[in-house]
């Protein structure tokens, strides 16, 4: 209950940040437009975000005969929940995510790199983690926050262009260049911090829930160590193009050398592994 209340407050904060940006752009009219825009985006995220995210990563559905589907099906039956659809992303960087508005309309996507690098037990640990996200309904919260955060980043960029080309010497029209630059920097960082607060505790809960579903915390712990190392060594092009979706993945897919990674939506892999090993 406390975690759900916290998430509601943080999602409301994301929406409020979007409204504030709208107010800075267009006064009271801008605030109303931003609020309407947020409502439309939340509605769209609820119904269509899973499809959009899967298209972003060119995910292809796996057949019911694929061994990954068999693992997901067995885990879902063990957990007493609906069997999600399973998708494959053709990318050598090992990672995975879950999406969908509820367990009945959920999807789990894995990369080809994950299947190539992990053992079947480790793959099972990862899939159980993603299934736990589905059961906890984190998938809806994640995609809604990603949608709003993406909108905030887009509007912040718009702010920058308006500040550069819409400001006149008499200070009568447009956005002041200094204000535009500040918003361009502060707004995405604020959105990222809110996403971080939403996502971190839910990752720990999904780790614990996934370990219970799979029956062996060590499988996920071993997988996380391999995934963390690989994602520091490789470049996930699609994730870099859509950074607002980074928190959907089991391991942060963004390049570790980037400044934005200081505000990671994921807790440290070392802490996650330590908690899993403590479950023995």
From Swiss-Prot:
GO terms for biological process, alphabetical: proteolysis
Localization (cell): Cell inner membrane
A GO CC term assigned to this protein in UniProt: plasma membrane
Transmembrane stretches, start-end: 7-26, 30-49, 146-166, 178-198
Entry EC number(s): 3.4.24.-
Enzyme class, broadest EC rank: hydrolase
Cofactor(s) this protein requires: Zn(2+)
Entry keywords, A to Z: Cell inner membrane, Cell membrane, Hydrolase, Membrane, Metal-binding, Metalloprotease, Protease, Transmembrane, Transmembrane helix, Zinc
Binding site for Zn(2+): 129, 133, 203
Cofactor binding: number and manner: Binds 1 zinc ion per subunit.
Main localization, broad class: membrane
Single GO MF annotation: zinc ion binding
Domain of life: Bacteria
InterPro entries tied to this protein: HtpX_protease, Pept_M48_protease_HtpX, Peptidase_M48
Keyword Transferase: no
Membrane topology: Multi-pass membrane protein
Active site residues of this protein: 130
NCBIfam families recorded: PRK03001.1
Family: Belongs to the peptidase M48B family.
Name of the protein: Protease HtpX
Organism per entry: Legionella pneumophila (strain Lens)
